């Protein structure tokens, strides 16, 4: 993702350069600044209060508001050199959501997990960890979901999100079983 600020004229860009220090920004011939988020540093010099960044001055326009791009505005407040960059929270949330959970699901992997759960080793592992044999309901539902909705990235992300929230709600670890076993052994 690259964020771009475009100026109306090259003269405005040239006049702006004398009032600010910019690091990590590439400047095009068309009069645009481009940078990758997190690499941008801009400091307004003290004498800029009379320059293009007079009190309350605002630069806006920025990349075409595509799904990946961010609409931002840069404001200087009171000539103190502070700049705020505002990014659209909706775009940030969409971007986080698109990278946080996978969009694809491997049906082969789901099938392997299902057969592993039903195997003797899988049942032994379940008995050792949780004190009981398992019916493999999670693996069956994952495999069924993969067969039916495995090619829909939105539904796959929602499924992974639901699984994470369900796992957080249940959170039974082997430590709980061992605590129960110790209390029964001590009686």
Curated annotation (Swiss-Prot):
Keywords: Meiosis, Sporulation. The keyword Lipoprotein does not apply. The keyword Protease does not apply. InterPro entries: Pants/Emi1-like. GO terms for biological process: ascospore formation; mitochondrion organization. Involved in sporulation. Required for the full activation of the early meiotic inducer IME1. PANTHER family: UPF0545 PROTEIN C22ORF39. Belongs to the EMI1 family. This is Early meiotic induction protein 1. It comes from Saccharomyces cerevisiae (strain ATCC 204508 / S288c). The lineage of its organism: Eukaryota, Fungi, Dikarya, Ascomycota, Saccharomycotina.
